[in-house]
Amino acid sequence: MSYRSLSSLAGLALGVSVMTMSASAEDLKGEIAPTGKLRVAIGISAAGGAFWSNKTASGGYSGVPVDLGKDMAAALGVPVEYVAYLNSGQITDAASRGAWDVTFLPQDPERETRMSFGPIYEVADATYIVKAGSPIKDFATLDQDGVKVAAVNNTTTMRGAKAHLKHVRVTGYQTYDEIFNLLKNGEIDAFALSRDQLNAMSKKIPGTKVLDETFKKTVTAVAVPLNHPQSLAFVTKFMKDAISNGTIRKAYDNNGLKDSPIRTQ
């Protein structure tokens, strides 16, 4: 076979390879960003941490999921669009409606039946904060008839608190801000949430106390709707790379979490 023929075959093979790669990229975009934008579901609250995002004064959003979503969209080569919800339970309920393409939220067995999870990027200890002046000092004195405990509705922490407390009825509320005000006004005895968020809350409400014990470890991970295999493969690789190349560390640092380690297990 002549050199020219070999060159032609090599060129043809390269062309087919490029076309295949291009088709694969388009297939991925069609699955993970069917509207032409990467729709990132975020939970809005002043709680902070690795899951919650905030509405900015300019009308935009800030937070770890906001930064990760923007970087993920850039890697895909599509614009980003944020879809805001009051809590992680609302994000979960919207998973089957095609309302979002990717999210970052606490993972538990119930949610694993409703969406597909990729790598964990945060592990948090869940506990309780008690109101100012409360005699409650530990889980034993908390778990008593008549004690009022609140949690954000339909969240992994609420399900964990309900399983943990045997004598207390845990009441769910739609937003962190609503429960914050109830605790501040002394209308509830305790609030179940992750320790880092409760530690920050205790500085805003003098006299409150975060209990030392932990009733649940909550893991936060990237997730996509069920039956999106290309999307899951893409976000899995993205998050593994983001953990190793400093992308997540940068997102933490940019959002007031410079002292928080990246915990993956």
Regions found by a protein language model. Give the residues of each.
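Alpha-to-beta junction loops
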Residues: 39, 78-79, 96-105, 146-148, ...
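Periplasmic-binding protein-like
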Residues: 123-132, 195, 199-240, 258-265
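A ligand-binding cleft/hinge motif common to bilobed small-molecule-binding domains
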Residues: 89, 106-114, 160-163, 184-216
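Acidic, polar ligand-binding/catalytic clefts
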Residues: 70, 74, 79-143, 209
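Extracytoplasmic small-molecule ligand-binding "clamshell" domains
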Residues: 26-106
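Bilobed "Venus flytrap"/periplasmic-binding protein-like clamshell domains
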Residues: 44-47, 58-75, 107, 127-180, ...
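Extended ligand-binding regions for polar small-molecule ligands
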Residues: 26, 63-75, 140, 154-155, ...
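Short helix-initiation/N-cap motifs at beta->coil->alpha
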Residues: 66, 82-93, 137, 171-185, ...
